[in-house]
Curated annotation (Swiss-Prot):
Key words, A-Z: Viral genome packaging, Viral release from host cell
Pfam family, one: TerL_ATPase
Annotated protein name in UniProt: Putative terminase large subunit
The keyword Transcription is assigned to this record: no
Source taxon at top rank: Viruses
Record carries keyword Chaperone: no
A GO term for molecular function: endonuclease activity
Gene: 2
Amino acid sequence: MSRKSYPNVNAANQYARDVVRGKIVACQFVIQACQRHLDDLMAEKSKSFRYRFDKDLAERVAKFIQLLPHTKGEWAFKRMPITLEPWQLFVICCAFGWVNKGSRLRRFREVYTEIPRKNGKSAISAGVALYCFACDNEFGAEVYSGATTEKQAWEVFRPARLMCKRTPMLTEAFGIEVNASNMNRPEDGARFEPLIGNPGDGSSPHCAVVDEYHEHATDALYTTMLTGMGARRQPLMWAITTAGYNIEGPCYDKRREVIEMLNGSVPNDELFGIIYTVDEGDDWTDPQVLEKANPNIGVSVYREFLLSQQQRAKNNARLANVFKTKHLNIWVSARSAYFNLVSWQSCEDKSLTLEQFEGQPCILAFDLARKLDMNSMARLYTREIDGKTHYYSVAPRFWVPYDTVYSVEKNEDRRTAERFQKWVEMGVLTVTDGAEVDYRYILEEAKAANKISPVSESPIDPFGATGLSHDLADEDLNPVTIVQNFANMSDPMKELEAAIESGRFHHDGNPIMTWCIGNVVGKNMPGNDDLVKPVKEQAENKIDGAVALIMTIGRAMLKEPDDFLSSLDPDDDLLIL
């Protein structure tokens, strides 16, 4: 008996290995997606890991899609079947190959792919939709190609319809009727059709394809499709898009969710995501970055075309943003994060514990925000190594009121609540009773910290801090009220960045602190680019933990020869209680 072969799965896994090893040029998000897959392949050997990679399923889907014909351009004229490139095989095999060990049902309910134009989005989406429509063992499958306009909804449905019309064996084998504006299977009532705008609440999709998600002003279609999948055994939400301009829209929000999943700050075992773009710091005018953002370069998008578009963009500022967005997948209206999250993650040391610093003085800092919101406590230790100051962030604490986590009514707060719920389950976020955070919880944590390590100072955000400040003073925890202005925050913010980049900063990998650090945007003082303070791009992008950490760095710097506050007016900028 001949041994089974898995050429497509093998190519997908080899792609992941080549990306991680640096043999294929890729951005950090692609590297993280590949590393996640490889890590999970190792983890599946453990009984505690809930999922396994089913090579047969993955190979089956990849083979099915490659039986379908091209519907556009030269390859369609030559009647050539689709050939999936290694990156496409990786996405397909991950999306369909990972299953629950017990049920064998699909692991990933949501798949988000962000990729520049002309990289074969519509063809791969049409293939996925047809597979779910005809071959996914779902009785009466409903498959929708959803978009905000009729033209966009047909971008996936039209090639899928043409694939069926040009493949009689497919329609005969699965009993597919191809109509003018929909396809159906009379045998079980399955149907596949385009969907425009808000679909209402009657749909029960098995698969929903959302093409060019960045064009959606609201998440109405996406959410309705997702919530309508409850009656399906293994539904699939397939979103594929280029970058856009609306960072207030649902696509950018989903992008942030994917990034948080990839960097581990908010785990989500049912979400697969991959983002093809350039890295922070890359020069968009450098021809070398084209391959990083465009995995299909030389196949469906030609290098010469991209080089000409790049040159036009360099010569015409009006075209620069279009090129960055559509060909490099850069959200041009999004402000860059201040701290390099890759460097931050390289500073992670999960072996750090409070016991290692027992008896050593520490600085506690508190960012209290609003009582309805997240409140933070950062804990910092310092050590001198080879004449240089090393900083250690260990066991930060975070609190949020119960109602903020579990009694959410407003749609815009839902994503934040889901994020908080994940952290509560992980044991890194403390929920306090009621609608407001009870500061007595925070005081008790500060008192407990002082028993482990003597607290030298407690810098605190002045917003609503009067009561807690007095309580801290009563416990001899030396509260210091810090006004979060340019003068007080600039130098410690720069020192934290320098310490991260030089390896002088160490942290225990707390996911909430990582999330807060990743949300920090630097705002320069008008007329003075040398002064900077931390701000957030959007209200839901909390930076409380990062602000508290920056305050601890500022107080630690006071002990160094260069006193960063020596020139300040203490009455205006620093109030010591």
